[in-house]
Amino acid sequence: MPLLDSFTVDHTRMNAPAVRVAKTMKSPSGDTITVFDLRFCAPNKDILSERGIHTLEHLYAGFMRNHLNGDNVEIIDISPMGCRTGFYMSLIGSPKEADVAEAWLASMNDVLTVASQSEIPELNEYQCGTFNMHSLEQAQGIARSIIASGISVNKNDELKLSEKILKGL
């Protein structure tokens, strides 16, 4: 089985909260597609609650589009990581990590303005596969933590696993 890009970086050295360019590629039509690792918490040290990350999934995707989409950037998708330590964001364009971090912080501030569970988008059995598994309180706690910590940048060259380590795994 081929080794995926996300498994070639050393998760023990990742900073969090942090932005990382996980992958850049060209579409057949020549558009730049960038995948960002938006790491909310340190791998193997912390984890986002299932209700909190699920509520963030519903809120964060819209808020990030409000703050990051523009003439040269269009978000395709923002999805939670299976390990529940963050989100992957795929987009057309190649924004700077600092711009992504700024949009992320603005989005976390937006999460804090949501007044009640009834304001969570698509929170119904028709549009959500687990519509009872939400917590605005937990999502807002995550947002407060990100705002208090600030967002740094993880660089692939600083996190790359050596061939020796990869062969030994």
From Swiss-Prot:
EC number: 4.4.1.21
Class of the enzyme per the UniProt entry, highest EC level: lyase
GO biological process terms on file: quorum sensing
Source species, domain of life: Bacteria
Record carries keyword Transcription regulation: no
Known catalytic reactions: S-(5-deoxy-D-ribos-5-yl)-L-homocysteine = (S)-4,5-dihydroxypentane-2,3-dione + L-homocysteine
Gene3D superfamilies per record: S-ribosylhomocysteinase (LuxS)
Cofactor(s) demanded: Fe cation
Key words of the record: Autoinducer synthesis, Iron, Lyase, Metal-binding, Quorum sensing
InterPro entries assigned: LuxS_sf, Metalloenz_LuxS/M16, S-ribosylhomocysteinase
Record's function text: Involved in the synthesis of autoinducer 2 (AI-2) which is secreted by bacteria and is used to communicate both the cell density and the metabolic potential of the environment. The regulation of gene expression in response to changes in cell density is called quorum sensing. Catalyzes the transformation of S-ribosylhomocysteine (RHC) to homocysteine (HC) and 4,5-dihydroxy-2,3-pentadione (DPD).
HAMAP family according to UniProt: LuxS (MF_00091)
PANTHER family: S-RIBOSYLHOMOCYSTEINE LYASE
Name this protein carries in UniProt: S-ribosylhomocysteine lyase
Organism: Shewanella woodyi (strain ATCC 51908 / MS32)
